[in-house]
């Protein structure tokens, strides 16, 4: 796991600091730093993937179903991290997510797509959650 992160950080200006920041966001990765990535749980692998992306210091982070198939406690950890990243600023996040509550808490703007067409859009936040749930019939 540590080597996996180091591979991304090597040769990047500020790579070491970016790795430390990513590990601060996902402390469980410090605990499993000696394990091979293939031996991690699904949630740990997802956290590792997000950490690797953050080390590159992107302007836009693309997250496609980051909580799919992950146990609820790890879903909460990922949600808290994404919310912290969006609040901190300086990083755009494009999130595709089936957990409506998480998506709405993270969103500044939302779009509901059905069959490739936008069927609903608006400002994010928990106030819009019912609108989205109705549009999705959830």
What are these regions (language model features)?
Residues 97-98:
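H-loop/switch region of ABC-family ATPase nucleotide-binding domains
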Residues 61-65:
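Catalytic Walker B motif of ABC-type/P-loop ATPase nucleotide-binding domains
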Residues 57:
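Conserved catalytic motifs of ABC-family nucleotide-binding domains
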Residues 75-89:
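Helical segment within the ABC ATPase nucleotide-binding domain
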Residues 36-40:
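Conserved ABC ATPase signature
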Residues 1-17, 25-30, 122:
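ABC-type ATPase nucleotide-binding domains, specifically the catalytic core motifs of the NBD
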Residues 53-54:
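ABC ATPase C-loop
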Residues 117-138:
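Conserved beta-strand-loop-alpha-helix hinge in the C-terminal portion
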